[in-house]
Amino acid sequence: MKQITIASRESKLALWQTNFVKNRIQSELNIPCEISTMKTQGDIILDQPLNKIGGKALFMKELEVAMLSNKADIAVHSLKDVPYQLPQGFCLAGFMPREDPRDAFVSNKYNSIDDLPKGAVVGTSSLRRKAQLLHYRDDLEIRDLRGNIQTRLSKLDNGDYDAIILASAGLIRLELVERITQFIPVEISLPAVGQGIVVIEALERDNDLLEKIQKLNCRESSRVATAERAFNQELKGGCHVAIGAYAELDNNQITLMAMVASSDGKKILKRKMIGDDPTKLGKLLAQEMIALGAYKILES
């Protein structure tokens, strides 16, 4: 293979992730790479919540079009931005090692969620974070926050918010870990499906490339991500509902923790299950939670 062209969004975090994959391909597979950057609709439409404008697929469509038109061979994504169902002909070809999956509490004035005064304004665009935060502290005011990491931090620094919630992984990767005031325990805020994992998307028809990319695959990331995504798929969850799932691998045993909540955080259901087949585990836990009223909670 002469060269691999990688499609990427233009943000600093997207380029960090893409360069991470590029460097691994070049050093471990000995194949030269180039990066092709592009803006997605998710990057352009910043004045509306994601759940109102089409969801996570808005961060991927342009990259997938580039692959279909032979302008790129693969695309690199943050797995939490990848819908549970990919368009026909696409697949997830390689999972990178997971960074810290927890949500991060970021504030210039307060040390933790517990330190926030009544009525404090917290910024997040995630229904999952909003619901869990309100369940823990129903006296807070949650306001939407869109944009890349730098934009969100500048809005905090300008005084628009008392605190904001971001993914720890992105801040760590951009060497902004000093901005994290508190790593939020998963007992308070269960992470998004796939949070902290960088993934490579490719075309199913490209067997030669898939075989090469598979050599970069992190087995642990792949197994825990498969469990989390199977849970999400069984529930048919997207960014328009408050769903969280986080799996840990110990030897061959996977512990999957999951949460569904109403958007106001007043109703919440959490469950845990252990198994060794990630797809089966995710489906079984989702079915158990559906039997316990998960859909009614998500609709409320």
Swiss-Prot record:
- Report the coiled-coil segments: none
- Which GO terms of type biological process are on file? protoporphyrinogen IX biosynthetic process
UniProt name for this protein = Porphobilinogen deaminase
Q: Please give the cofactor(s) recorded in the UniProt entry for this protein.
A: dipyrromethane
Pfam families per record: Porphobil_deam, Porphobil_deamC
Its EC number is 2.5.1.61
Q: Which reaction does it catalyse?
A: 4 porphobilinogen + H2O = hydroxymethylbilane + 4 NH4(+)
* UniProt modified residues of type S-(dipyrrolylmethanemethyl)cysteine: C239
Q: What class of enzyme is it?
A: transferase
